[in-house]
């Protein structure tokens, strides 16, 4: 950021401002014309002798204003104001209502209407005639107007996205920067008004989105294009003259002439960037920069009176218009004078005293307390019987999660991200906080979705403040009843998990008291909106609980809920379980088999795609040569190949969905293994999320887990084997000769 700043002379804020223009309507000095999105046109006179904020006139139109231009567009009439709107091009004349020229009015002369919305325009100067206006529509078609006549209309360009346009009178060339390409067109080609697409003389790939274009006249005309990340200059033949790389995003650009140096060899330009900086260049040489204290989207260099010539006029996105000039005094600090004498002995004593205070403060625990930042609390709110959200399962209940924030002073907005397998109206929420409030809260409903069945009831909330760059994250488990409802038990389910306890089993109808079951030894649950069921059984003789289901993904969430309820009902009881490694191996085998089939389908898709393209090429060649006899055979072959291609793509998508479901089941088994290991007081890194949110293969993740989650015993053995050439104690190692004798 520059140390120098722009000194403000005149400023005013007009809401919904879209464009600004400097034009001379009287007294051989310039006035400022401001156009708005609401159709308002304001003509102000900053160089007025009494007040700088003097407004000549304000006119309301019915259309949003895109661009304005001022010139002698009509014969025998000077300084006509041309206003471009999405549907009209309107000409206005300025009439003064008072003899002292302090008040004026805008009178509409005539207008041209468009059938397609306009995008921008440029002025085409004509020797010994009135200037013309070239308008580009939103679909990249050009229309030329001269006064009240339309020369031609809707001439198409070879582009889809409109961009800046400019005209060079010296070479009579039109420049367009559409689709990220700068192209040159001879203006004489468009004089016929043909509806055929026009060929370019030359084109250049800018590699970025063009924002603004300026064209300079003279013996060496130059086209200067401002893009988001660079400024490029081109000569008449399309060669790059120079280029400037911007450190921030470019916002606006304007050219100007120096009042003291009359040298047309160089181009002088001002570029504004998104980091509130104005860059003043002489061609590609940076001669000055300053802090604009705003990010201008429009720039002008105007002379409003003889006292303030070549002042800079800027327009901000919020409608603030500032007229100022470059300051030469740094606004951050001033360098000390060279005559200041520093007493180094006193400075050293001062540093020693400060160091002693810091040591005493550290010994006492520190005098500076760490700022806690934003505090977040999660709690379960109302549980409703049925939600009306469109993405919810049929007859699914909802649960409101209350998110409470505290210590949010000076925080205006919080970005909340939601991570949960349960559905909600939105995964991203923006919470607006009042500036005078220190607390805020929001309720977010959760329910079972209609597209994806959840395998976990865990909800993670992350709140981020863009201003302070602070982020807080909390997690909570949704109630079990939000996901499941009571159903019939299934004793013949394929997948089982056993939970052992040191004490007698507890009645299941008491553990799950919110359900209406009266059976103390068996209870069944089904996921809302689906036929997925899970059953829980209690065995009094063996003091065990058994969980059975046809869906692996339901074992983990049910076992976790069961263990939590047992621990709450009987504190201190020992609980354990057997990790189902055979289910993991079975799921891994199925994933590998599906991935093999997916690779075969991918090869088949590539083969059929090449075959379809070859048939299309043969068909086009036959049409060009006129050999139409083999078209029925090619049509039949194309139909067969295309159907096989569609079948292979359907199979590929189906296998991809199956692989994702199997991966979700495997992640659930990993979390189940982590939960059962934790019951035995063994923490492991292999949980349900260590592979879920990565793009790595399972083999790579397991390698990382083995290196990361190793016990001290394995580390000791590894170090001993790598660095100890001695024999291990208490282990008899026989020599090779003795082994050979025993073998003989």
From Swiss-Prot:
By its UniProt entry, which InterPro entries does this protein fall under?
PHTB1_N_dom (IPR028073), PTHB1 (IPR026511), PTHB1_hp_dom (IPR055363), PTHB1_pf_dom (IPR055362), WD40_repeat_dom_sf (IPR036322)
Q: What happens when the gene is disrupted?
A: Mutants have normal body morphology, but with reduced body length and width, delayed larval development and decreased roaming movements. Defective cilia structure and function characterized by an increased accumulation and mislocalization of intraflagellar transport proteins and impaired movement of intraflagellar transport proteins along the ciliary axoneme. Disrupted assembly of the BBSome complex at the base of the cilia. Defective avoidance of nitric oxide and P.aeruginosa.
The UniProt keywords, alphabetically, are:
Cilium biogenesis/degradation, Protein transport, Transport
> Which spans does this entry mark as compositional bias, Acidic residues?
734-744
Keyword check for Protease, yes or no. Answer: no
Kindly list the GO CC terms recorded for this protein.
BBSome; ciliary basal body; cilium; membrane
Region Disordered: list its residue ranges: 722-744
Q: Which GO terms describe its biological process?
A: cilium assembly; protein transport
* Regions of compositional bias (Basic and acidic residues) in chain numbering: 722-733
What subunit structure does UniProt give?
Part of BBSome complex, that contains bbs-1, bbs-2, bbs-4, bbs-5, osm-12, bbs-8/ttc-8 and bbs-9. Interacts with bbs-1.
Q: What does this protein do?
A: Component of the BBSome complex. The BBSome complex is thought to function as a coat complex required for sorting of specific membrane proteins to the primary cilia. The BBSome complex is required for ciliogenesis but is dispensable for centriolar satellite function. Required for proper BBSome complex assembly and its ciliary localization. Required for cilia biogenesis and both the assembly and movement of intraflagellar transport proteins along the ciliary axoneme.
Q: What is this protein called?
A: Protein pthb1 homolog
The organism of origin for this protein: Caenorhabditis elegans
